[in-house]
Every structure is written in C-alpha cells, then in structure tokens.
Amino acid sequence: MAARAPELARSLLAALLAPALVALLVSPASGRGGRDHGDWDVDRRLPPLPPREDGPRVARFVTHVSDWGSLATISTIKEVRGWPFADIISISDGPPGEGTGEPYMYLSPLQQAVSDLQENPEATLTMSLAQTVYCRNHGFDPQSPLCVHIMMSGTVTKVNKTEEDYARDSLFVRHPEMKHWPSSHNWFFAKLKISRIWVLDYFGGPKVVTPEEYFNVTLQ
C-alpha cells in the first residue's frame, strides 16, 4: 500500500491541475492581439474588405485592422551585419474607426530592431489579414495572395511632442498591457514615415500604392 502512495498523490495532483491548465490553454490574452479581432469591437467581426481593385483603400483597411506587423531592418548584429533582420512589432494607426494610416509603434532601445534603426532608420513593415479571422473563415493560407497582406517601406522616426499623445492613445487602446511595461526600458513612440506600399490581395503580383494615394483615402 505504501508503494502506491506516490502514485495516488500524482493522480490527485493531476486531477487538481487539469482544469487550471485547460483554462490557460483556451483563454485568450487580455490584450487585443491575443484575440481573433480584439477587445474594442464588441461583436469581433471585421468590416467588409474594400474592392480588391482599390489598392489604396485595401492598404488602409489592412493597416487599420492590424494589431502587429513584421518590421524588417538591416542588422547590426556582428554575425549577420548587413543582412535583413525581422521582428514582430505591435502597431496601431489610431483608435477604432479613426485610423490615420500612420503605423505607430512603442519601442525601446533594448530592442534589436531599435539598435538597427539607430544606424539605418530605413525599414519595411509587413501586415497581414492572417492575424484576423478573415483568412481562417475563408480557408485562405497565410501565404496566399487572397489572404491580403501589405508591405510598406520607409523611415522609422520618433514622433514629436505634438503627436505623442495621439500615438499613446492609439497604441494603448489596442495594447493596454503597454501601460505597465517597465519605464526603465526607456520606451518611446515612433512611426513609419511611408515612402512606398505594395498590396498583395490577388494573383498576378502586388499593386504599387504611393503615399499620396494611401493617405487620400477616407475610411468609412
């Protein structure tokens, strides 16, 4: 009987921990990026995708519904200096329904991307509807052009004091966890000053969109 005691103890512990483990696995993160499409749209449904022939509007749509993107920089790491180097960056172009098209970021000098940007501020930001329910609901693979994604190149710049409050409000409404990140990391607000945009939303190659076309769009 004594030999079975450890076995019984392990079984009891497993039974007690199982519900907690399941809850952790199925519960979404409290931040917007941990859900199918966020905390701020109550019904969690995407608005309709703009007509695919309207590249500028599609680009603005993708930017506005994206919570994060892949930011590619030119690496300053000794072993891969001069090579492309990408990292995931949380973004926001404005409060829900009020997107400006400017992709704001909250960055720290401790991030490798920031070290790269200090030497060369040119970067490319990629955003995809794969982060929403759109592609999943339609059965589109993330690499498929039908799973709309955009690439925008430009220069990452620190926002000025006038723009800082808007950048803060835009980011914190979508990423509330940011408010509690350690101040010792010297966070600052930045944005991508866009020079060129590519929209991949159908077969046959990307549409090229200029910044003027992009910012002339009024979101409905």
From Swiss-Prot:
One of its GO terms (cellular component) is endosome. It comes from Mus musculus (Mouse). This is Protein CREG1. Residues 30-53 are annotated as: Disordered. The lineage of its organism: Eukaryota, Metazoa, Chordata, Craniata, Vertebrata. Residues 1-31 form the signal peptide. GO terms for biological process: autophagy; endocytosis; lysosomal lumen acidification; lysosome organization; regulation of DNA-templated transcription. PANTHER family: CREG1 PROTEIN (PTHR13343), PROTEIN CREG1 (PTHR13343:SF21). InterPro entries: CREG, CREG_beta-barrel, Split_barrel_FMN-bd. GO terms for molecular function: insulin-like growth factor receptor binding. Induction: Induced during differentiation. Widely expressed. Residues 33-53 have a biased composition (Basic and acidic residues). N-glycosylated. Homodimer. Interacts with IGF2R; the interaction is dependent on glycosylation. Keywords: Glycoprotein, Growth regulation, Secreted, Signal.
